[in-house]
Each structure stands twice: as structure tokens, then as C-alpha cells.
């Protein structure tokens, strides 16, 4: 750690060759020194954070440890940035990031990048709950979900499977320069910061300066992690008149030294360093540092920090060193001895490559890669074993930093890997010399996608990242979506989650269904259930509700009339012209009182016999026709709720009528969306859309409606069981192709092949593997692949027992809730009581 300790931590003190004192059971000198330090001083004395200049936003550091001569206290200055981890990378990103080395750094400067898997998700959960309407059942559902997820931040959320923790990945990027700066140095530092932020931005990492309150909160998390079941609800208060180090560490922090780790509260902190690297690596592969995407057993079972510390060497001195070492290694590799020692040949080849890189202008840097684990007490060995297995599966070898835990722990704190600590690492031979290209490709800047900005849906990634999903956050296109989910994969739960999220945050939702899948949930949530039966007395005359007779309205009315005339086949342009003439004429004459009867009469009086035939075909929908009661007179279809389910099951045997009813309902919903507030979310869900959209004239209607609702802040969401369902008719295909969002739950192989053949979006080898790996764990979660403008991600919908009861389709559970409500329970309390009774019966109470 510190230069004065170099003599105390030599190879003779390592576990492999302990000295006599160690063999007698006494602690090694390094542990003894720190143990003695912690008896008299706190951890704060080992931190260098001194002050912050609000004008320049630079940090000034000075190490204040008691065993350092006050006249020799190492000083540094610099800045700390936070960047959002990227969910992926390519060669172009790596090339852009390489630009960070095209700067003129003072010799000895350090760059540090830390990726922190933070368990502090309480703030995100609170934002999600807080977005729900206060006192509603939706708020209760959100709170129960949040409570459930918060249990999975320190220990696995699922007891009978591999470790799964819920997290929020954060990434910091720091540059520290040696010495006490003058005005010129400060000016250079500010220029460097601007340049680095520009490089990061160009690579897809918009950076922000970490101000003292945020730094104190982050350091507090790392040096004083919350106990299991608790969270950091209060951030440390920043006082510009008190050294930062003293504000960063609570006086209650009790740090204990162990041979292979530290103990802080109920955490057994353990630090590891990279001992050997894979022969080939790319930046995109660093996303596996947080856990294997495909193998559940290769995960990190606790909070952790993955760090790269980079020391900027003297370029000329480094080149001389490379030339010297390369010549020796190459000479040895060419010697007769190398025939018997293959390692010498490999070493020679490696140094020849380094020499060639340097000769071609590629610069070198000295780096350290480390991982700090934060397992619960008693679980450190297990966590160490699992993270070693993860890294080894990728070609990296990790080793525990025995007797060097404090130094490694400090190096994993944001901005703490400074020029002085880097020099100590160099003295202990802990820095590797590699090309700057390799530095960039091993930076821990990748994690899982954290979603969109608004807290609508809340999912979590396979490696635990909590993510918000909101289709209405799409600034690049429309808000429409398509859901593809095979039987048993959790489609109803997922659609219910979308609908309850929209309604719970103050929006409106309509569900058009055949099969009564949403009847019980609708009634349980106090929604409006509209059933189209012979005796329902519902009138849906489309003319009654027209407010503005614009081009879009006319287009959709034409498609409705055309659907009634030719439910399966097509209609030529001439016939569509006659329909338009009829609609325009009757609207001018009767306005909102117009009906299908008026359209039919107009066509029957037309001189062309083909138009007359069309009038005859419309007879079933006129006042004397079999379906006239649905269309004659004023529309009685009203939407009196924020959640409306329209059930078309009874029309299933009357396909020609069902197709017209669907189009009129969609038109009516669009009109409601138009009347609503633009900033209020509005969504219409059509389940088993391919079957409902089988009408021959629906395609143009769908295209117009999908485009139209975007202007009203509305969205359509269709759902089918397989991709090829969307290709069973032109209207369903139009819905598929006009949806910017695609949600794919578990699929059969043939459905994935259909997706690939459709060209809807590119499905290469990797994405194909991702889609085939999508799974549903009953009682645990449903996975969904989310495709949106700009990329894709996998999220898990994890449902708590309370929400599961709300979404239940079991008649006995709905009946039980209704009985409790009749006894005076609120709806939210009734569901709560049902969950309590079930839990009690499980435990025999």
C-alpha cells in the first residue's frame, strides 16, 4: 500500500514461505501494521480525499496516514466521472475509447475505472412505487413487488437455484495526477477532462462529474455497506469545511483485518487480483465480468467491484525497458535451451509482438485488474470460488491478495487508485505492462441494460440489473408493440403487468380479447367488463361518436363499410370510391345520426348495378337485418373506467360480425385517446390478434390507426403465440410491422426461424442463441427478449405472491376476494388477506 510498507511485505511473508513468526501463529508484518493502525486510527486516515473546488470541479487529495511523515504526504489532484455502463460493445467502440490515450498526461498519472454491482436499489424501487396512484391497489401491488425484490440484494432471490441477486450496476472513471497543481496544471487538467468526456461521449458513455455528495454516498456504500435487509436511506451530508475523508467514513465503521480478507459489519470483504490473462480478448467480452449470460451457475453471488487501475509511465523510459526486455527474451527464445523449455519460446514471441507494437507507434501502459467481493460473513469462500470459476471460464485467473487486502480494497474505491498507490503497486510487482489497445479492451465498462427513463414496467436482467421499460419513452418512432409468447410462457401475466402498470400510473388501458382470459383480473381490479352478447343491448354505430370528420376518420369508416361488404375478399378502387361517396353524402345529410341503413340506401339508388349489389350485401347490418341492433340508432358503447376489457367470445362463431366489431371498437378507442390528455399513457391490447384481424379490409385500417394514435400519446399492443401468426393475414402483418417494440417470451425453434426469415430484424447466430435460451420458471419468473429501436435486451418479470393473486385466473380466488370485499375489506386489503391465509396454511398455522 504505502512506500514505507514495502519492506514489510516481501515474498518471504507470503503464505507459501512464511517466516518463523508466522509459523508460530503470529500475524504477518503487513497485517500487524494495519491491525495496529486500526486500533488507534480509522479507515478515513487511509483515504486521500481532501477537498473539492466547486469552480473547477477538481478534487485535491492528500494522504493523512499516521505512519507517513507530514512533510512527505503524497498529494494528487484530478476528477471523478460517472458513466452509464453499456450493454454491449464492438470494435468501433474500442477504437474510440483508445482516443483517451491520445492525450498528454503528466508522467505517473493514473486512470481508474470501477464497475460496481450495487445492492442499493431501494431508490429505484421507491421511484417505481411512487409512480403509482396513492392508496390504490396498484400502489399496493408495486410495494409488495418492491419488498420482494429488495430481499434479493444480498442473498439469492431464489433458494433452490444458482445465485440470483438484484442490482444496479454503476461505473466510475477517474483521472488523478501527481503533485500540487499550479494554475497551468489546473488549466491542463480541465482540458484533459473535456477531452476525456468527449471521447467517452463519442463511444456511447455520456459522462457526468461526480460531485462530493455523490462521491461520499458511493464511498460510504463501499466502506460501510448496509447490513443484510437494510439500505442506505440517508446520504452523508457534505460540508465543504471538513476534509472529505472524514465525511466519507462513519465513525461506526469497524474494520477487522484477516489474512485473506477484511470484515466490515456483517460483510466478509475479499479482494482478488488477476494473475494471468487469456490469449485473446475483446471489449465486448468484458460483459461476462458481471456473470455468464447463458450459464446460471457462473455468477457472482454478492455485491462486487471490478476495477482496472492504469498508470501512465514515462514513454521514453518505457520504450527503453521494452527494447531491453524484448531483446533478452528473443535472444533466450533463440537459444538451444528454448527447445526444452517451451515457455521461453512463448515469452519470446510475446515480447517480439510487444516490440513490434511499440515500433509501430502503439504505446504501453501499466495496469492492475482487481475484484472486490462483499459477501455475507461465512460465505466468502463460496463467493471466492464462484468468481474464480467465472473468470477462469473466460480464460482469466484470479488469486486472493493475501496480506495485501487493504491495498487492494483501497484501489477499488472511486478515485483512490492514485499515483502514490500505483507506485506502491509497482514496487510489489503488481502492475502488468500491456499495450494501450489491450488496456481499452479489458476495461470494465459493460453491464446490463438499465432500461428506459420512466418507471412503468420493472424487470431485471439475468445478471440482476433492475430495469424500467416504458414503450412511451421511444423518441425514435412509435409506441406500438407486439408480444410473441408460446403457451405456458407467461403471456397473460406479462400483458396484465403492462396494463396494470399503465393504469396504475394514471393511464388508460383497453383489452380486446376472445376467451375471457382477463375477465377475473378486470373485475378484481374494479375495471369495466364489456361483453358482446346477443342480449347485451350494445349499440356501436360508428357514426355516433365522430367529432371531426377528417381524412383519417373517413379512411377508417371506409374500411369498416368495406369489411361489412367483403369480409374476406378485396374491394377494387371503384367500389371504394362508391363507398366514400356514400359515407360523405350521408354524413352531410345526417351527421352523427347516420347508420349503415343510410349507406345501403345510397348504394341501392346508385345507377351502377355493382353499387346496388353492394347495398344489398349490407342488408344484415341495416335496421331490418340480423345484426341491425348493433348498428341502428345511437351508439351506447361508453368507456367509464380506466381499465376496460371488451370480450368478443360470443361473436367467435360470427366471423363477419366479429371483424366489423373489432374495427369499430378500435376506432372508438382511438377517439377516446384523442379526447384524453396527450401526456397520459393510453394503450389498447389485442390478444390473439391474428385471429381477430382476419378480416380482408383491416390492413389499411390498422396502418392508419397505428400511425394516428402516436399523435395522441396512445399505443396498440398485439399478442400472439408465435411469429408466424402475424403472417397469417395482411392485417396482423401490418400490426407486426408497425410496432417498434417486440416482446418475445419463450418460443419454439420454428418460431425463431420464422422471425429470421421474416427479416423483421436481424437474427444472427448470437441473437438466435439468446432467443432459444429464453425460459420461464413457474413460480419464479418469465423471461422476455425486448427488441426496440437501438437494440435488444433480456429481462425477467419476477412476480411476488400478492401480484400473482391479482393476476390469477382461478375462480375460487376471485370469489374469495369478492367475499372479503363484501365483509368490508378494501380491494387491496382483501388480496392481502388472501395471501396471508395461503401463507398461514403453508406453514400449518
Kindly give the residue locations of the regions a language model identified.
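Extended, folded cores of ATP/NTP-driven motor/assembly subunits in large transport
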Residues: 1-444
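Conserved nucleotide-binding/hydrolysis micro-motifs of P-loop NTPases
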Residues: 86-88, 119-121, 180, 515-517, ...
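Short, flexible loop/turn elements at secondary-structure junctions
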Residues: 85-87, 117-119, 175-179, 375, ...
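Glycine-rich phosphate-binding loop of nucleotide-binding enzymes
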Residues: 60-76, 84-86, 91-105, 197, ...
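Short glycine-/polar-rich loops that comprise or flank the Walker A/P-loop
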Residues: 108-111, 506-507, 527, 712-714, ...
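P-loop NTPase motor core of the ASCE superfamily
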Residues: 159-167, 471, 549-601, 724-726, ...
Amino acid at each position: 500500500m504505502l512506500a514505507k510498507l514495502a519492506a514489510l511485505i516481501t515474498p518471504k511473508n507470503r503464505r507459501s514461505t512464511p517466516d518463523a513468526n508466522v509459523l508460530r501463529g503470529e500475524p504477518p508484518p503487513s497485517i500487524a501494521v494495519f491491525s495496529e493502525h486500526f486500533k488507534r486510527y480509522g479507515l478515513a486516515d487511509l483515504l486521500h480525499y481532501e477537498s473539492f473546488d466547486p469552480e473547477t470541479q477538481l478534487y485535491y487529495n492528500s494522504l493523512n496516514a499516521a505512519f507517513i511523515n507530514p512533510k512527505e504526504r503524497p498529494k494528487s489532484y484530478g476528477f471523478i466521472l460517472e458513466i452509464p455502463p453499456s450493454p454491449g460493445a464492438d470494435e468501433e467502440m474500442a477504437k474510440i475509447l483508445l482516443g483517451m490515450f491520445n492525450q498528454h498526461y503528466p508522467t505517473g498519472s493514473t486512470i481508474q475505472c470501477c464497475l460496481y454491482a450495487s445492492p442499493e436499489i431501494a431508490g429505484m424501487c421507491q421511484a417505481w412505487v411512487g409512480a403509482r396512484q396513492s392508496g390504490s391497489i396498484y400502489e399496493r401491488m408495486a410495494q409488495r413487488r418492491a419488498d420482494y425484490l429488495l430481499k434479493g440484494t444480498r442473498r439469492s432471490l431464489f433458494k433452490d437455484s444458482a445465485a440470483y441477486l438484484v442490482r444496479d450496476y454503476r461505473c466510475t472513471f477517474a483521472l488523478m495526477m501527481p503533485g500540487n497543481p499550479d494554475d497551468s496544471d489546473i488549466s491542463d487538467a480541465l482540458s484533459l477532462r473535456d477531452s476525456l468526456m468527449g471521447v467517452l461521449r463519442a463511444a456511447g458513455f455520456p459522462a457526468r462529474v461526480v460531485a462530493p455528495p455523490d462521491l461520499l454516498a458511493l464511498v460510504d456504500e463501499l466502506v460501510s455497506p448496509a447490513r443484510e435487509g437494510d439500505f442506505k436511506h440517508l446520504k452523508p451530508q457534505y460540508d465543504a469545511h471538513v476534509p472529505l475523508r472524514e465525511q466519507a467514513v462513519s465513525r461506526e465503521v469497524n474494520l477487522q483485518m484477516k489474512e485473506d480478507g477484511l470484515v466490515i459489519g456483517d460483510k466478509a470483504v475479499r479482494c482478488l487480483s488477476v494473475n494471468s490473462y487469456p490469449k485473446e480478448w475483446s471489449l465486448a467480452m468484458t460483459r461476462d465480468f458481471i456473470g455468464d449470460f447463458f450459464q446460471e451457475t457462473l455468477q457472482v453471488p454478492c455485491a462486487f467491484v471490478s476495477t482496472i487501475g492504469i498508470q501512465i509511465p514515462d514513454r521514453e523510459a518505457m520504450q527503453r525497458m521494452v527494447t531491453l526486455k524484448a531483446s533478452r527474451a528473443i535472444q533466450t527464445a533463440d537459444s538451444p535451451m528454448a527447445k526444452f523449455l517451451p515457455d521461453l519460446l512463448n515469452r519470446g514471441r510475446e515480447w517480439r509482438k510487444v516490440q513490434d507494437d511499440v515500433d509501430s507507434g502503439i504505446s504501453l501502459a501499466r495496469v492492475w485488474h482487481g475484484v472486490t467481493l462483499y459477501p455475507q460473513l461465512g460465505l466468502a469462500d463460496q463467493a471466492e470460488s464462484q468468481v474464480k470459476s467465472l473468470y477462469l471460464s473466460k480464460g482469466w485467473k484470479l488469486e486472493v491478495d493475501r496480506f495485501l487486502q487493504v491495498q487492494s480494497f483501497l484501489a477499488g474505491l472511486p478515485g483512490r487508485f492514485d499515483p502514490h498507490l500505483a507506485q506502491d503497486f509497482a514496487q510489489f510487482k503488481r502492475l502488468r505492462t500491456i499495450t494501450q489497445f489491450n488496456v481499452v479492451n479489458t476495461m470494465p465498462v459493460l453491464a446490463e441494460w438499465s432500461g428506459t427513463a420512466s418507471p412503468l414496467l420493472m424487470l431485471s436482467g439475468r445478471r440482476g440489473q433492475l430495469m424500467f421499460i416504458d414503450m412511451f419513452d421511444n423518441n425514435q418512432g412509435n409506441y406500438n408493440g407486439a408480444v410473441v409468447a408460446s403457451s405456458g410462457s407467461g403471456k397473460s401475466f406479462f400483458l396484465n403487468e403492462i396494463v396494470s402498470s399503465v393504469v396504475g400510473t394514471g393511464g388508460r388501458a383497453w383489452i380486446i380479447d376472445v376467451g375471457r382470459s382477463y375477465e377475473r383480473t378486470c373485475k378484481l381490479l374494479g375495471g369495466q367488463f364489456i361483453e358482446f352478447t346477443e342480449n347485451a343491448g350494445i349499440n356501436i354505430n360508428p357514426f355516433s361518436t365522430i367529432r371531426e370528420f377528417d381524412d383519417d376518420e373517413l379512411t377508417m369508416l371506409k374500411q369498416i363499410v368495406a369489411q361489412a361488404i367483403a369480409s374476406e375478399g378485396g374491394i377494387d378502387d371503384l367500389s371504394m370510391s362508391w363507398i366514400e361517396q356514400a359515407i360523405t353524402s350521408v354524413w352531410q345529410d345526417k351527421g352523427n345520426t347516420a347508420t349503415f341503413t343510410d349507406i345501403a340506401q345510397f348504394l341501392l339508388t346508385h345507377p351502377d348495378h355493382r353499387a346496388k349489389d353492394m347495398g344489398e350485401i349490407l342488408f344484415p347490418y341495416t335496421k331490418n337485418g340480423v345484426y341491425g341492433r348493433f348498428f341502428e340508432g345511437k351508439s351506447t358503447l361508453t368507456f367509464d373506467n380506466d381499465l376496460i376489457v371488451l370480450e368478443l367470445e360470443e361473436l367467435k362463431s360470427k366471423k363477419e360480425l366479429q371483424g366489423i366489431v373489432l374495427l369499430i371498437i378500435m376506432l372508438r378507442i382511438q377517439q377516446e385517446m384523442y379526447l384524453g390528455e396527450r401526456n397520459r399513457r393510453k394503450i389498447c391490447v389485442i390478444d390473439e390478434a391474428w385471429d381477430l384481424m382476419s378480416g380482408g379490409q383491416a390492413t389499411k385500417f390498422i396502418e392508419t390507426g397505428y400511425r394516428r394514435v402516436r399523435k395522441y400519446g396512445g399505443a396498440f399492443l398485439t399478442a400472439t403465440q408465435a411469429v408466424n401468426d402475424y403472417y397469417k393475414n395482411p392485417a396482423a402483418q401490418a400490426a407486426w410491422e408497425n410496432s417498434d417494440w417486440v416482446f418475445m417470451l419463450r418460443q419454439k425453434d420454428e418460431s425463431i426461424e420464422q422471425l429470421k426469415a421474416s427479416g423483421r430484424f436481424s437474427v444472427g447466430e448470437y441473437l438466435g442463441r439468446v432467443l432459444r435460451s429464453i425460459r420461464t420458471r413457474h413460480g419464479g419468473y418469465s423471461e422476455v427478449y425486448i427488441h426496440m429501436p437501438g437494440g435488444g435486451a433480456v429481462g425477467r418479470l419476477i412476480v411476488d405472491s400478492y401480484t400473482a393473486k391479482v393476476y390469477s385466473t382461478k375462480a375460487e380466488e376471485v370469489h374469495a376476494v369478492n367475499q372479503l370485499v363484501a365483509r368490508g375489506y378494501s380491494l387491496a386489503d382483501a388480496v392481502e388477506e388472501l395471501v396471508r391465509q395461503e401463507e398461514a396454511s403453508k406453514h400449518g398455522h
